[in-house]
């Protein structure tokens, strides 16, 4: 049975709606070769990965969706050659093991494994990479919490990093912005924001590489052009039988990336992202601007880590910036989903590079 996880749930889409329209860039370039030597480092080393057990590691890096997994694979395992845009939806990669041991009783039918994993060496330390098949929306928060507790018990990491795409919350953030924090807040519908539970810790990333003069050369500006944006809006209007202009869908030009993507490391501080399993979209009016981004897992990870005093941080890339507050919510969600599909591969690359730099 196919996964019932819906990565577009935060856009207000059903799984069927999410699958019915998945646009892409007409001529999306490949991800570049990662020149680790520019910052005086070596490429991650590929280690033998045991099957059927999660090995000990000093750090765990978890990601969630196919395009995020492709970017993680590229940066941590295969950065010596370009990665084609067409591989962004690949469902598997050589060298990864599937983990299905100790599934909890009463788990939903069709959910048969926790995720995929492999080990690499970064900065002289063993790092466990994990592509999760266990999500907040499916099979649900209980299973997601169980996954994190199992990783903590079996791997005994010093820190767990969750990385991947997110919706923009800051009205100034262009597509491709990366914001890293060490706190997550759980959205609770119908409750005032002041009562939403927050889970935080004091882990602070090492910014020696992030702050180096040559680090920006490792980044890849999101290649969405004005022509691409016009084509995407036309395809969007055709699918949804609408007539919105680019100026209405993207009034502030946020879907055109910065020449050098912004990497904002706020780990160790008070900034928090927002976790949701329902429709939540940041807007140009500043809705949810007190948070760094909007995603679908991390506060639950923070809660599980905090219970065992395990350090954690979240490195999230803006795959879909804030939406035009003047548009109907359905249009906001649908447009955000279109941009996410077209560009999440590229935004995830920069997030993965930032996560690597924190560990290297």
For each feature predicted by the language model, list its residue ranges.
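Accessory terminal and edge-of-domain segments that mediate assembly/interaction
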Residues: 1-360
